[in-house]
Amino acid sequence: MSADRINLLRTKVFDKSKWMQLPRDVVIGHDVIEQIPAVCEDLALGDSVLIVSGGQTRDIAGKRVEALLAGSYDVVTFAANDGNPFETIRKAEEAAATAGFVIGVGGGRVIDTAKIASYNTDRHFISVPTAASHDGIASSRASVPTADGNVSLAAEPPIAVVADTAVIASAPHRLLASGCADIIANYTAILDWELSHRLRGEPLSEYALTLSRMTAEILFKNADLIKPHSEESAWLVTKALVSSGVAMSIAGSSRPGSGGEHKFSHALEKLAPGKGLHGEKCGIGAIITMYLHGGDWEGIRDSLKKIGAPTTPAAIGVDDETAVAALLAARTIRPERFTILDMGLTEESARDLVKMLYRE
């Protein structure tokens, strides 16, 4: 080797860097809500806390969290009620600005409000989900509804997750089934990510991709174990949702859990607002996109059926024409995110795909 080559090797500097924010404490199990004081003490986040909850979720778990912390912290509460979501977030930010840290106790809307308020005020966030309906309980993204459909915003990933399986199992089974569908949809999300990597050169994280695939596989293979109001089921699904959120934090984006199936879900929300839960629509979208990828779409469909999640537009109150329109409109949702639905899908093909969903 020449002297010049040796000098070149000596002067070459490795300059890659990455910042990953992951939960420090993850506490899942029966009655673990009682361990919230210990979690807060372990993290040493400050002397004051803002507890964000909703009308129902405050009764379900929020009041208990308030009572547990009242003796040791200056507790302020905030109700994330229905209304203009951005106004709700603004008010939550005002409340968070005077608190040492933020706890979100509730479902998707409450958790997302708390995460965004935490992010915008540079406060640590603890996630206390009352339902396991989607992977937002542990991710660094939040979804906010607008007149033009849901928008995805940067949010504070939780420094801790405290998921009480007794509370989660008591929620309607539809919410748990929706969470399962959201996780199983990771299968097609990572296929879209790999497709974009091959065709567009999009950066890909093997660690995040592998974790996302493994998480989806666990629920896919154990669909028979997901039963209504079972703490074992809540345990399995909640661990998967946390794992999926961690995969997103490793990737630095929602790519490990969001592909064409999510774009279809967001398009449906825009065209048929209020029809179906987020995870339910992602599950239906995953059947379609798995078919387009040439994968085991029937396996996806059958797993969703076992869990109790819908597999057709009709099952969530959406007519087939609207589903076709959503498939065609999906390419306009986050156009920078390339998926299988951006490969020239025609109206005729979209109609055939929707018909395929009803096959036995």
Swiss-Prot record:
Single GO molecular function: metal ion binding
Coiled-coil region list: none
InterPro entries: G1P_dehydrogenase_arc (IPR023002), G1PDH (IPR032837), Glycerol_DH (IPR016205)
EC number(s) per entry: 1.1.1.261
Residues holding NAD(+): 108-112, 130-133, 139
Cofactor: Zn(2+)
Entry keyword annotation includes Ligase: no
GO CC field: cytoplasm
Source organism of this protein record: Methanoculleus marisnigri (strain ATCC 35101 / DSM 1498 / JR1)
Cofactor note: Binds 1 zinc ion per subunit.
Catalytic activity from the UniProt record: sn-glycerol 1-phosphate + NAD(+) = dihydroxyacetone phosphate + NADH + H(+); sn-glycerol 1-phosphate + NADP(+) = dihydroxyacetone phosphate + NADPH + H(+)
Compartments, as annotated in UniProt: Cytoplasm
Superkingdom: Archaea
GO biological process per UniProt: glycerophospholipid metabolic process; phospholipid biosynthetic process
Disulfide bonds: none
Amino-acid positions noted as binding Zn(2+) in the UniProt annotation, renumbered to this chain: 182, 262, 278
Recorded family membership: Belongs to the glycerol-1-phosphate dehydrogenase family.
Gene3D superfamilies: 3.40.50.1970, Dehydroquinate synthase-like - alpha domain
Cited function: Catalyzes the NAD(P)H-dependent reduction of dihydroxyacetonephosphate (DHAP or glycerone phosphate) to glycerol 1-phosphate (G1P). The G1P thus generated is used as the glycerophosphate backbone of phospholipids in the cellular membranes of Archaea.
Protein name as catalogued: Glycerol-1-phosphate dehydrogenase [NAD(P)+]
Ribonucleoprotein keyword on record: no
Binding positions for substrate per the UniProt entry: 135, 182, 266
